[in-house]
């Protein structure tokens, strides 16, 4: 077979493969205009929780098609929450960590005068990103909250994820990795500085390897690899056309505030610019493949894989409320 004939066959094969490849699509399937500013999303089984700042928090049943949410506003300015198997622990701007019963009643609080920005629960321990107080660990039992320990940070602790025996903290100044195997004596295990503002993070594990995506405000997104000891190493970055030197909380434009993995895709809640989708199949070169404008302020994003291989994307869109999309990558 001649070279030219083989070349034609290869082109025909590639054309056929492209013709049968499902195009990338991001389609909105649900919108709910909350009474406050939708700030963060949490998923727990068939329950979808929205931290709605001035509107308290909302709980939707996913199986019912998100109809008739339970709206609870016992706390002022809910920034984030941990579902905690139907007993939510709220991170409140003014009231600290707040324990809520399944019926919506407040059963306990922990406050130290700073702002609780994010919380995750493991067993009877709540781990909080607590502003200038850094990482705060609280024991929750019988509806009460008691301080166990803390680890101050040099920046403003804004978000965290628990991964194995470590807490990964977005500390504005950078990513802090904390060994929490002894909750009474948390110890810093690693740190990676940010060129702008490290606001939020998302962790993806595969084959024993951990890849962390960082939302870094005007520095866009960063991809970071963690080794077993928790030492972070920067793999790549995409600035999304932003400038690290620009001021925080801009009145317009982008400022990456949250990220969420969806397979090898990464979703970035990019402030007034809406939702960005990046293809990270080549982790050394993440590239933007879609941008969806927002009528609000894109603040928090979570994803969930569906049986057909698509993803549901849940966006806390500030003054525009909750938006849900289906993504086919």
What are these regions (language model features)?
Residues 1-3:
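N-terminal secretory signal peptides that target proteins for export/translocation
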Residues 6-15:
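Bacterial N-terminal signal peptides
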Residues 18-329:
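Feature marking well-ordered beta-strand scaffolds used for ligand recognition
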């Amino acid at each position: 077979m001649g070279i030219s004939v083989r070349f034609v066959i290869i082109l025909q094969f590639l054309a056929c493969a492209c013709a049968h490849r499902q195009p990338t699509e991001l389609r909105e399937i649900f919108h709910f205009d909350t009474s406050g500013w939708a700030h963060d999303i949490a998923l727990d089984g068939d329950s979808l929780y929205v931290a709605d700042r001035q509107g308290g928090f909302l709980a939707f049943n996913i199986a019912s098609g998100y109809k008739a949410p339970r709206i609870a506003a016992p706390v002022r300015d809910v920034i984030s929450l941990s579902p905690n198997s139907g007993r939510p622990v709220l991170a409140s701007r003014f009231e600290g960590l707040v324990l809520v019963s399944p019926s919506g009643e407040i059963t306990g609080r922990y406050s130290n005068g700073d702002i609780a920005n994010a919380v995750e629960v493991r067993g009877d321990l709540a781990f909080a990103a607590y502003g200038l107080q850094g990482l705060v660990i609280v024991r929750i039992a019988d509806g009460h909250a008691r301080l166990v320990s803390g680890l101050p940070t040099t920046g403003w602790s804004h978000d965290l994820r628990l991964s194995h025996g470590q807490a990964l903290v977005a500390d504005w100044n950078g990513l802090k990795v904390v060994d929490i195997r002894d909750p009474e004596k948390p110890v810093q295990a690693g740190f990676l500085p940010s060129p702008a503002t490290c606001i939020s993070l998302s962790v993806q594990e595969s084959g024993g390897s951990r890849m962390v995506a960082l939302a870094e405000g005007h520095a866009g997104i960063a991809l970071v690899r963690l080794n077993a000891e928790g030492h972070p190493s920067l793999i790549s970055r995409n600035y999304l056309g932003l400038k690290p030197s620009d001021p925080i909380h801009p009145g317009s434009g982008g400022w990456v505030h949250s990220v969420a993995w969806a397979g090898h895709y990464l979703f970035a809640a990019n402030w007034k610019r809406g939702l960005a989708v990046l293809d990270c199949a080549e982790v050394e070169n993440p590239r933007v493949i879609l941008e969806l404008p927002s009528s609000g302020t894109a603040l928090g994003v979570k994803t969930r894989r569906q049986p057909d291989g698509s993803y549901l994307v849940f966006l806390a869109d500030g003054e525009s409320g909750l938006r849900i999309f289906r993504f086919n990558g």
